Amino acid sequence: HTMHTMARVKNLNLAEGESPEPMIRVQGETQVVAAAHALIANTDAEAASLVSLYEACPDIVHVVTPGVDLYTFTPGAGRTAAREFVGINHDALVVTFVGRIQPHKGPEVLIRASAELVKHSPQLRPKLVINIIGGASGANTEEVERLKELTSWLGIDDVVSFMPPVPRADLPQWYRAADLVCV
C-alpha cells in the first residue's frame, strides 16, 4: 500500500484555523498499516512517519521515490515558445509554484520571499512574474483567499498571479516558461 498523504502527519502540521483530519481517517489508515504485508513510502521521512506515527514494522516499509513522465516533461521547444504559449513576456523573471494550495507546501513562503525581493531589489519588480498554479485542497478553500489577501497586503498583487489548476497537457509549458520552479 502507498499513502498519498497521512492524516497524522497532516494533523501535526496544521496551520492556524485548519481543522484536523477526521478520526475515522486516522483509524482507517492505522488498520491499513496493521494489515499490510508491504508499505511503500516516497521518502525516508515518510517511511519514518509510518513507523513512528502508525507503528508500522520497519521491515515491511520500502522507499520507492516517485518518477517523472519523461515523455511529457521534456525541454520541448524551449523557454521562448513556452512563454508565448502561456502568455508571459520573453524577458520576464518567472518563478512558478504548481500544486494544491496547502500551508505545508509553502506558497506563503514564496509570496513573502517575493515581497522581500521586490523590497530589496525594486528594479526587478517590472520583470518579476510569480505564478501560483493550483486550487484549494479539500474543504480548505479559505487558504487561497488568505494568500490573495496576504499578496495584496504586501503590495505585490502586480507581481503574483493565482491561477486555477491547468490541464496536465499544459503543465510542461508552464514549467518550461519558468526560470525557477518552487516545490
Cite the ranges covered by each PLM segment.
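Carbohydrate-associated surface elements
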Residues: 45, 67
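Membrane-proximal helix-turn-helix segments that form the acceptor-binding/catalytic region
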Residues: 7, 20-39
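Acidic donor-binding loop of glycosyltransferase active sites
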Residues: 37, 176-183
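Conserved donor-binding/catalytic core segment of Leloir-type glycosyltransferases
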Residues: 89-105, 111-114, 131
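Short alpha-helical donor nucleotide-sugar binding micro-motif in glycosyltransferases
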Residues: 165-166, 173-178
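A short helix/loop element that forms part of the nucleotide-sugar donor recognition site in Leloir-type
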Residues: 20-21, 74-88, 147
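Active-site proximal beta-strand in glycosyltransferases
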Residues: 1-11, 39-40, 62
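Nucleotide-activated donor-binding/catalytic signature segment of Leloir-type glycosyltransferases, i.e.
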Residues: 127, 134, 142-169
